[in-house]
């Protein structure tokens, strides 16, 4: 019902296992790593590397990216770094400082987990997340410093603070206060919910224009009494997005609107799947779900059928029946990468991905002719040979 940042990840350190989780509910398991060792998830194409090494082996795909890290990061065995590409960025997993208890023995041991403390791109530019050390927002990100030295303050609010603000606004406006509870359920189907939400983002320091900082937040967020994102306002305090939710199911969005555009509405089945997408100014769609099959019909009565195979994150569309009656089919390998596609005329094109990177190294057309692709350690295309035998080459500078 709240909001999430795709890169907001957390690492649990157990005796023989490392568990990398995001706040979308995904968890990846890695074996224990020694300093400088790495683990790789083929299903997610993601590396996890433990610090404590000045350089990685020269032939390692992440060797160049590793050198982009500040020395204090790649030399620290207590930090872990994750990336899904040899071109970066690195997600830096460390720990946030906290205020020790009065009777606590110091120095306190490091916690058995790591949280996101920053990002580093392949040019060495950093983005640092500052977390509160104490108080009601302890451990939460309340500040960000970017690579240009600009500092942004993230204003967080609790459910009780938003409830009090709603009551004060009602009193000052001479209206009856609406029902706005002081607390939210501590646990929902989306996971634990402490009721803390991002309410505004301010630019508080800009080294280029230190005396010309904006007098208003860059963006502001409004929330429903149930903690759902209700509206987004830009720096001129103009509402640019709005959201509506199901009365019965907390967090289930039933409508959204961009300012100046029509409202898009959604209907759901008893399993929480979208059955209708209604657009008053364009095409609307209905969705019918069966086992390994989804039927999509638009408001012009055109129908497509998607046939799926696999489970969870490896579920893929293996066959598509188009509105014109034609059928296309796709094949995937064990980790969900495309291997072949067959068009409506029965012609098959084959794809050969690299075992480690997933990058396409060869495409074979239905008539047996092949194209080949070659990459550098940054996963950048360096040369390609077409079916006609012609070759193209690309060169890149050091940056």
PLM feature segments, named:
Residues 1-7, 11-399:
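Extended charged/polar low-complexity repeat regions
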